[in-house]
């Protein structure tokens, strides 16, 4: 089984390497929403690029990757496709909400090696896409689901305006909806809480990687989750896996 894990805690690296797990490192300056980032010379597996990039940023990324030893890259900015087209590495596109049907996925697969299938879908919809995709795809099986990303420092600005002690990570809720927000110099990322649990999708065919994104979990929980699929004491939910996404009022009773 091809498990891919975002490195959100440096203490787990050696343990996961012993289990032949593929590691995905958030790349310093080109990534947001994490507690830990890595310089390119620290990365010997896959790197993650998930922030909004300017023309200058893409040129900087191209230069950064040119002499690297990475095996592949996960990214969500389409401009990166052109910047890395001559690099002999695996190229995986993260389209999130857009990668929700096999036609869109197969179109983009002409330009990249794989695509992360949207987690806004039911189990049946995901299985159908996988069966019709012309290349192996990536499936998110455990993660905090990203809600939004702003290049503004929303948390810092809020604390400054109200003269509150600054925190770069906050837990908040609106009625019965909970989320976690992470702030750093490159912007603010919001995640839905609890964790998205799609572990029942493991062992499907035509899958390049099963992606675990264990942000905010401690070392022991990450090891148990990734190696044993043990989610004891980790709040989780299937979200849309067993119910359709509500797009409009008419869908509420669908």
Residue ranges and their predicted role:
Residues 1-103, 112-254:
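Active-site pocket-lining/capping segments in soluble small-molecule metabolic enzymes
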């Amino acid at each position: 089984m091809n498990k891919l894990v975002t490195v959100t805690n440096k203490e787990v690296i050696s343990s996961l390497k012993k289990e032949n797990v593929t590691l995905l490192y958030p790349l310093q300056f080109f990534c947001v929403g994490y507690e830990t980032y890595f310089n390119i010379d620290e990365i010997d597996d896959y790197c993650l690029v998930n922030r909004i990039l300017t023309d200058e940023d893409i040129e900087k990324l191209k230069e950064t990757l040119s002499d690297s030893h990475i095996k592949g890259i996960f990214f969500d900015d389409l401009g990166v496709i052109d910047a890395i087209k001559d690099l002999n590495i695996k190229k995986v596109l993260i389209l999130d909400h857009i990668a929700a049907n096999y036609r869109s996925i197969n179109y983009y697969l002409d330009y990249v090696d794989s695509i992360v299938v949207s987690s806004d879908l039911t189990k049946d919809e995901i299985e159908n896409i996988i069966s019709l995709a012309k290349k192996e795809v990536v499936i998110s099986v455990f993660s905090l689901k990203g809600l939004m990303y702003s290049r503004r420092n929303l948390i810092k600005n809020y604390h400054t305006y109200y003269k509150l002690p600054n925190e770069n990570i906050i837990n908040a809720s609106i009625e019965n909806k909970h989320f976690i927000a992470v702030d750093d110099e490159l912007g603010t990322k919001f995640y839905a809480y609890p964790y998205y649990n799609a572990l029942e999708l493991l062992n499907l065919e035509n899958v390049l990687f099963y992606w675990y994104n264990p942000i905010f979990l401690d070392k022991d929980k990450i090891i148990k989750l990734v190696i044993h699929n043990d989610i004891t004491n980790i709040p989780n939910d299937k979200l849309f896996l067993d119910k359709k996404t509500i797009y409009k009022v008419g869908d509420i009773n669908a």
